[in-house]
């Protein structure tokens, strides 16, 4: 019986079909302009760009220009690339222009589709970012599609790893910029650590098209981009704790693979306490006393490293380094490190050099970075399974674009075996059969370990001619993928390694020409060889087609249906024939974790013999149900993490906007004066409470506070003895003295140097305190979950306490800036020119090796204003005049004669 919803869909079509149908008339209008565009000369076609820009300047809307602009790009692509976008590609381009996700199957020409909305939106002059997953694709697409933009008078830039700031600035200044998601995010963070607006490289976030949008906005959504600086060396502690884990028995801990957690049992806790006592690392009466918080953190990391993280699956060891493997793509991520000491725990486990732990200087998630764009769009072959997440988090609709030719791939039911060994025997048999008839085979695995195990099995069975595509060999992955469609080719790939490069039946002629002919000079000989290669590729294509097209053979189901669909989608591109099949066993991770016991019992009742498989649509449905559960759980995790990250993101936006205002400000004297007044008001309120009697006033505390923060030794203890004096009188006297001292200093420095000094100190102090604040938020986040046990909502508690921490940070900023500006002095050879610009924040700060404190945090910030800072001998320092002290070390005795260290006396401003 057909449901009412099903009946309505039959009559009216689905919402997706209606949306595509609504765009069809515009595709026809673009088609109607084709002959007119073909009649134009190259120069006249290029002249359309200036014509469109003039119309925009005169008040036209981008939507008004869509039809003629798309027609121009279609003709330019035909002339420059020999490629003419189909009508379905025009529709895909319209969807991207509308700020939605275009789901287009593999081989449907997503790279070409992007040129249509990119050109249209680049006409505004605000810049368009095209985001790819790796440097290879960014370079390839910028070079390839840049020919179309260049033909039409637009500039194209590309951002890849290793570029200088000047090169990045030039690339972002282009009309169209191709870049990886990582480079974009890191450039944004680095820009917000610069000290001059002119040093920044990005120029705004107007419009971005994200290629492989599911990979970037879903799979990597939980991974924050972090810029960090090293803390002190704790390698000995990591190694010691690692030895403890090796002494534990299985009864000492519990591992939940589903939740990815590992915890100590009571027996384990007792054993660990004894080990810590022996190593003199235990404090208090219990492991979970507050004194042991840091040790517990290290223990938990070491347990996770040994019981949840597997070598060659989650990471590999290369050149004495632990390198993370992306769980979704199987690619290595050199330079990426797990945070909070987990990476150091893995290094201790693998007995490689332990790198220093890092302190976060700046961080952002892809979720929050990409939500900054005024308009965001995306392309992928598989987005519909995550449509709810795209809608809820990014406000993006998913629109399935029809294929140009019908998909003729056959997706066969899964074959399920009882054991892994039986499954692998069946896989080897299947590969041999397909190879014998000349069918190209892509074998999908879930980890490097499994891909290499299968490779070894094939070698033992006499199959030696195959390629492995995984994180160990990703340098060659584009070429390997491009030739995986040759008849009888066997390619073993982890997850979606090689995404972004089509598998063409018979191989890719252009890549073969590039590989085989390289830099061979143009001429008759090269032409003849190119022709021979193209003819050979065509012959091989016909042979592969006759054998049934590409066979995608998957060795396991992934947690996400989307990853499975991506793997299937490698076959059957542009109407080619193909087939796909999954080979599973009850011992596979997904089956084992999500309840295969019942299924095992059923298969035994059915009398399933060794090497026999069960093939039934019911199995597929059961697995899909398990995958939906995992997807829903992962979505909930990401959604929940985003709620917490939004708290930090709101604060980040305030701080980063404030930095830009400070950098742009010509004169900060008003801002600095307000900060100084706030500090005075706070001191008076703290030491002279409202409505308190004079004898209750803390004159001594106020005097010390004024000396500490304002560098003024005022007779406050005498003032309070005066008859009828009120708190407002004291406030006014302090304010008058402070303003006078500040004005004298400004006059001595001159306006140029004073402006530079104020800007430098405010910016560097803000950066320092923001970094400390990030650490405090991390600590708060790690413990806030326990509030749930007290029947309080952890998120609300986090919001409330994070706000209090932020307010405290702003208070500390006012105090630190005031204290430093009231002490800063110049020791210089020439006063004519201001000092050179301060170095970038990442290099400007040095952490004290013994205390872990930042050298510039307090007194040393004053050296920013010095063209030639010097250390003054003790006998030349006047204890009552800090201007004679010169550079004072943080751990030196304070020159004022208090007997305290400088950092605990006049150096305690921050």
From Swiss-Prot:
Main location: membrane
InterPro entries named in the record: Helicase_ATP-bd, Helicase_C-like, P-loop_NTPase, SEC_C_motif, SecA, SecA_CS, SecA_DEAD, SecA_motor_DEAD
SMART domains: SecA_DEAD, SecA_PP_bind
Cofactor binding notes: May bind 1 zinc ion per subunit.
Reactions mediated catalytically: ATP + H2O + cellular proteinSide 1 = ADP + phosphate + cellular proteinSide 2
Topological category with respect to the lipid bilayer: Peripheral membrane protein
Pfam families according to UniProt: P-loop_SecA (PF21090), SEC-C (PF02810), SecA_DEAD (PF07517), SecA_PP_bind (PF01043), SecA_SW (PF07516)
SUPFAM superfamilies per the UniProt record, alphabetical: Helical scaffold and wing domains of SecA, P-loop containing nucleoside triphosphate hydrolases, Pre-protein crosslinking domain of SecA
GO-annotated cellular components: cell envelope Sec protein transport complex; cytosol; plasma membrane
The protein's required cofactors: Zn(2+)
Binding of Zn(2+), residues: 894, 896, 905-906
Enzyme class: translocase
Known EC number: 7.4.2.8
Keywords: ATP-binding, Cell inner membrane, Cell membrane, Cytoplasm, Membrane, Metal-binding, Nucleotide-binding, Protein transport, Translocase, Translocation, Transport, Zinc
Family of the protein in this entry: Belongs to the SecA family.
Protein name listed in UniProt: Protein translocase subunit SecA
Taxonomy of the source species: Bacteria, Pseudomonadati, Pseudomonadota, Alphaproteobacteria, Hyphomicrobiales
């Amino acid at each position: 019986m057909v449901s009412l919803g099903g009946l309505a869909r039959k009559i009216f079509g689905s919402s997706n079909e209606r949306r595509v149908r609504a765009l069809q008339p515009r595709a026809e209008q673009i088609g109607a302009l084709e002959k007119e565009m073909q009649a134009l000369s190259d120069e006249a076609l290029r002249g359309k760009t200036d014509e469109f820009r003039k119309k925009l300047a005169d008040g036209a809307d981008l939507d008004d220009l869509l039809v003629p602009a798309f027609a121009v790009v279609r003709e330019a692509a035909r002339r420059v690339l020999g490629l003419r976008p189909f009508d379905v590609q025009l529709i895909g381009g319209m969807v991207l222009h509308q700020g939605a996700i275009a789901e287009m199957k593999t081989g449907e020409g997503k790279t070409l589709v992007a040129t249509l909305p990119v050109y249209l939106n680049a006409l505004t002059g605000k810049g368009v970012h095209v985001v790819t997953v790796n440097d290879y694709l960014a370079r390839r697409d910028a070079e390839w599609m840049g020919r179309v933009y260049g033909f039409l008078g637009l500039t194209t830039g590309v951002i890849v790893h290793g570029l200088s700031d000047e090169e990045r600035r030039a690339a972002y200044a282009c009309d169209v910029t191709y870049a990886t998601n990582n480079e974009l995010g890191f450039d944004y963070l680095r820009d917000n650590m610069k000290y001059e607006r002119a040093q920044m490289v990005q120029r705004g976030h107007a419009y971005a098209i994200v290629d492989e949008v599911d990979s970037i906005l879903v799979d990597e959504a939980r991974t924050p981009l972090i810029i960090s600086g090293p803390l002190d060396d704790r390698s000995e502690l990591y190694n010691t704790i690692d030895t403890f884990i090796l002494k534990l028995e299985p009864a000492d801990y519990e591992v939940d693979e589903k939740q990815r957690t590992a915890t100590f049992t009571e027996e384990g806790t007792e054993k660990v306490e004894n080990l810590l006592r022996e190593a003199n690392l235990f404090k208090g009466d219990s492991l979970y006393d507050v004194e042991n918080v840091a040790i517990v953190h290290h223990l938990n990391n070491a347990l996770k490293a040994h019981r949840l993280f597997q070598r060659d699956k989650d990471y590999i060891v290369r050149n004495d380094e632990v390198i993370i493997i992306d769980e979704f793509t199987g690619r290595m991520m050199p330079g990426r490190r797990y945070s909070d000491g987990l990476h150091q725990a893995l290094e201790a486990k693998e007995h490689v050099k332990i790198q220093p732990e890092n302190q976060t200087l700046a961080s952002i998630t892809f979720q929050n970075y990409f939500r900054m764009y005024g308009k965001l769009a995306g392309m992928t072959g598989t987005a519909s399974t995550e449509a709810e997440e795209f809608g809820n988090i990014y406000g993006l609709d998913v629109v399935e674009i029809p294929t140009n030719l019908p998909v003729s791939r056959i997706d066969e039911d899964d074959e399920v075996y009882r054991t892994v060994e039986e499954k692998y025997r069946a896989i080897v048999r299947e590969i041999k059969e397909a190879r014998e008839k000349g069918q190209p085979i892509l074998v999908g695995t879930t980890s490097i370990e499994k891909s290499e195990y299968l490779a070894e099995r094939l070698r033992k069975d006499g199959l030696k001619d195959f390629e492995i595509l995984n994180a160990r060999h990703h340098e060659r992955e584009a070429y390997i993928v491009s030739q995986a469609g040759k008849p009888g080719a066997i390619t073993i790939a982890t997850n979606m390694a090689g995404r972004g490069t089509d598998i063409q039946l018979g191989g890719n002629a252009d890549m073969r020409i590039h590989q085989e002919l390289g830099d061979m000079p143009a001429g008759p000989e090269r032409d003849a060889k190119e022709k021979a290669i193209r003819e050979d590729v065509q012959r091989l294509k016909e042979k592969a087609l006759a054998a049934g097209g590409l066979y995608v053979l998957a060795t396991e189901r992934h947690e996400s249906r989307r990853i499975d669909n991506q793997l299937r989608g490698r076959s059957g591109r542009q109407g080619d024939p193909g087939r796909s099949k999954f080979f599973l066993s009850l011992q596979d991770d997904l089956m084992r974790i999500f309840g295969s016991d019942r299924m095992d019992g059923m298969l035994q009742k059915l009398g399933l013999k060794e090497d026999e498989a069960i093939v039934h649509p019911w199995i597929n449905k059961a697995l899909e149900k398990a995958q939906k559960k995992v997807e829903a759980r992962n979505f909930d995790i990401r959604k929940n993490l985003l709620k917490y990250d939004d708290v930090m993101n709101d604060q980040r936006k305030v701080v980063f906007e404030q930095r830009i205002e400070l950098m742009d400000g010509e004169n900060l004297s008003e801002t600095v004066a307000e900060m100084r007044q706030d500090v005075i008001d706070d001191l008076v309120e703290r030491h002279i409470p409202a409505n308190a009697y004079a004898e209750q006033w803390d004159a001594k505390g106020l005097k010390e506070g004024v000396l500490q923060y304002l560098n003024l030794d005022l007779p406050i203890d005498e003032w309070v003895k005066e008859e009828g004096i009120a708190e407002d009188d004291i406030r006014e006297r302090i304010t008058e003295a402070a303003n006078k001292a500040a004005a004298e200093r400004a006059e001595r420095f001159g306006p140029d140097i004073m402006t530079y000094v104020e800007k430098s100190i405010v910016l560097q102090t803000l950066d320092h305190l923001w970094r400390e604040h990030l650490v405090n938020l991390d600590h708060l986040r790690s413990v806030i979950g326990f509030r749930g046990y007290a029947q309080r909502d952890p998120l609300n508690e986090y919001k409330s306490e994070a706000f209090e921490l932020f307010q405290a940070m702003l208070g500390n900023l006012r105090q630190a800036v005031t204290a430093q500006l009231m002490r800063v002095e110049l020791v210089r050879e020439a006063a004519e020119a201001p000092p050179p610009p301060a170095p970038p924040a990442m290099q400007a700060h040095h952490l004290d090796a013994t205390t872990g404190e930042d050298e510039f945090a307090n007194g040393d910030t004053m050296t920013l204003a010095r063209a030639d800072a010097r250390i003054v001998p003790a006998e030349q320092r006047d204890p009552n005049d800090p201007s004679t002290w010169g550079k004072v070390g943080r751990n030196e005795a304070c020159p004022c004669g208090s007997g305290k260290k400088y950092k605990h006396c006049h150096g305690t401003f921050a």
